[in-house]
């Protein structure tokens, strides 16, 4: 009896184990089936696989982040093609630089005119007469630095090397040469000194009035204002500053400047390097002497102040930066300082600083006519109002030289 029961128990145990295994296998299959159904989500009709072009683009982006791949590409490039690209880039930069320079000069001109009008400065009548369509390129603008007390000097220049009346207009129209006496205004605008200049200007019409208070210690500021104002009024190749006690041969000056017309950033004059004077009370004392080093040092090379010329781009540079250019006690030093930190061509021409007769006379007889003549001992022609006619007679180039000259 017990054996029978034991056999039945064994048979049931076997059957239960078999069904257990089958159930496990079935559950596993069902689980796998539902799992695949959940993860295999149908793709949306709006989605697409990346195209070949997109795949290539991804590849390029990934390679662009790989320095090694970039290096290999650059090495494989044709050297001539690289040089061509460099040359094209250089040309493009030059064109851009010229465009920027032109825009800067136009901006400077507009700014100078606007400031003059806003400040109500007693400028020359030429400013009001100037119209945009009338603007032309001149050879040079010659500004004769003068003072309220220098009426006799001005008259002596009008009687010698500065053409008057219709001849001066002809000089502007045919030769492209502008000549003006340059002066500012007194501390009391509209006073007797200003009225005297206005009356003289009505008679001769040869003044350029500046928005500047006259004073010997303000020559650096006057020089800066002159170049800025002249640049805003006349488009010229060169801008010249000369003192009113110096004799000038205009044709020779023009021929000298024309030789340098194609050069950029030209600064022409008799270059010198005098001592920096730290002692108070002496002439040409430099209050900021300590900026030039130890006692006994000399200034950097700069053109002597009796006569010098700068090219158009340098006049533009002064006009644009006039509010930040530092002024030293001596105006010729100031001008040299403004150019010391930029790429400027300094031209030392000793014909711009000849002595009075017999020096300039001997040179004229030898065929080497001087551009300017004066006495070094007086920083100009000594007693110029009385002696300049004699200098003109013995050292002048002659009126025919001016009208026959071609610039």
From Swiss-Prot:
GO cellular component: Golgi apparatus; Golgi membrane
Membrane-spanning parts: 13-35
GO biological process: protein glycosylation
GO MF annotations in UniProt: hexosyltransferase activity
EC number: 2.4.1.-
Names of the cofactor(s): Mn(2+)
Protein keywords: Glycosyltransferase, Golgi apparatus, Manganese, Membrane, Signal-anchor, Transferase, Transmembrane, Transmembrane helix
Principal location: Golgi
Record localization: Golgi apparatus membrane
Membrane topology: Single-pass type II membrane protein
The protein's annotated pathway: Protein modification; protein glycosylation
PANTHER family listed in its UniProt record: BETA-1,3-GALACTOSYLTRANSFERASE 2-RELATED, BETA-1,3-N-ACETYLGLUCOSAMINYLTRANSFERASE
Annotated family: Belongs to the glycosyltransferase 31 family.
Role description: Beta-1,3-galactosyltransferase that transfers galactose from UDP-galactose to substrates with a terminal glycosyl residue.
Protein's UniProt name: Probable beta-1,3-galactosyltransferase 2
């Amino acid at each position: 009896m017990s054996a029978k029961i034991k056999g039945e128990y064994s048979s049931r145990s076997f059957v239960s184990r078999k069904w257990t295994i089958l159930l496990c296998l079935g559950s596993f299959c069902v689980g796998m089936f539902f799992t695949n159904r959940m993860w295999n989500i149908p793709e949306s009709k709006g989605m697409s696989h990346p195209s070949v072009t997109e795949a290539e683009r991804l590849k390029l982006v990934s390679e662009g982040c790989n320095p090694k791949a970039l290096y290999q590409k650059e090495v494989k490039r044709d050297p001539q093609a690289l040089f061509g690209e460099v040359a094209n880039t250089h040309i493009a930069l030059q064109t851009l630089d010229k465009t920027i320079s032109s825009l800067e000069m136009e901006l400077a001109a507009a700014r100078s005119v606007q400031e003059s009008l806003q400040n109500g400065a007693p400028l020359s009548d030429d400013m009001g007469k100037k119209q945009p369509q009338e603007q032309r390129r001149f050879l040079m603008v010659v500004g004769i630095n003068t003072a309220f007390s220098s009426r006799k000097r001005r008259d002596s220049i009008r009687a010698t090397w500065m053409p008057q009346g219709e001849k001066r207009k002809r000089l502007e129209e045919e030769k492209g040469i502008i000549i003006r006496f340059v002066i500012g205004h007194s501390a009391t605008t509209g006073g007797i000194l200003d009225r005297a200049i206005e009356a003289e200007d009505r008679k001769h019409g040869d003044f350029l009035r500046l928005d500047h208070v006259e004073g010997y210690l303000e020559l650096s500021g006057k020089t800066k204002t002159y170049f800025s104002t002249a640049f805003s009024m006349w488009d010229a190749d060169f801008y010249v500053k000369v003192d009113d006690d110096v004799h000038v041969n205009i044709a020779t000056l023009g021929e000298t400047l024309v030789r340098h017309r194609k050069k950029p950033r030209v600064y022409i004059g008799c270059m010198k390097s005098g001592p920096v004077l730290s002692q108070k009370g002496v002439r040409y004392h430099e209050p900021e002497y300590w900026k030039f080093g130890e006692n006994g040092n000399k200034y950097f090379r700069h053109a002597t102040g009796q006569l010098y010329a700068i090219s158009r781009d340098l006049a533009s540079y002064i006009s644009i930066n006039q509010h930040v250019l530092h002024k030293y006690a001596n105006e010729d030093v100031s001008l040299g300082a403004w150019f010391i930190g930029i790429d400027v061509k300094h031209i030392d021409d000793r014909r711009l600083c000849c002595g009075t007769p017999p020096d300039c006379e001997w040179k004229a007889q030898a065929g080497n006519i001087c551009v300017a003549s004066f006495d070094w001992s007086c920083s100009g022609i000594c007693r110029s109002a009385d002696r300049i006619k004699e200098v003109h007679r013995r050292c002048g180039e002659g009126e025919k030289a001016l009208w026959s000259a071609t610039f």
